[in-house]
Amino acid sequence: MLKVALIQQSNSSDKELNRKKLTYNISKCASEGAELVVLQELHESLYFCQTEDLANFDLAEPIPGKSSEYYSKLARKLHIVLVTSLFEKRAVGLYHNTAVVFEKDGSIAGIYRKMHIPDDPNYYEKFYFTPGDLGFKPIQTSVGKLGVLVCWDQWYPEAARLMALAGAQILIYPTAIGWTSNDTESEQKRQREQK
């Protein structure tokens, strides 16, 4: 049986502090036997898509890059398969919300670029991200074929269907969304029931 850990933590604007907390939590999960660890969507920072601010493009980086190299080393050190979610700067003016899957040896097993990009109040992702261009292809890892998608992709069942038809054994959706403290209790309940 595969032991899986999911990490969804509160973040701050301090990227290094977020990474330190993640490292602690990932290490704890690995020490408790997790072979597959999945991080939340855009885990390096606060969820910045609540505003349209050009300064937030400074958070993006290439893959491979500083963050992916860090998580590669961590996956290798802990001997885990690690699913991350990074703000990818692919080229000038071309940015993606990208899941990067690291194998137990630290190599990049594969990436998935989020295809369905929301543009709703507090979710201004179309300002930041270009839809993915890699299709729906499972990523082969030592723990199985992972159908990695990102957040809002779950509202479109065809993505999950295509992953399953292509042989995905597990569907994974790093996600940042949820209710906010100013949502009514009935709205929070409605959102929990849709998951």
Predicted ranges, named:
Residues 1-10:
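Short beta-strand segments enriched in small/hydrophobic residues
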Residues 4, 26-55, 75, 82-83, ...:
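Active-site beta-strand/loop signature of hydrolases that rely on acidic residues for catalysis
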Residues 14, 46, 92, 116-119, ...:
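Generic structural signal for helix capping and beta-alpha/helix-loop junctions
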Residues 20-21, 51-54, 97-98, 162-164, ...:
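Short, glycine/charged-enriched secondary-structure capping and boundary segments
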Residues 58-148:
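Catalytic-core segment of enzymes that process non-peptidic bonds
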Residues 60-83, 145, 151-195:
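CN hydrolase (nitrilase-like) catalytic-core segments centered on the catalytic cysteine
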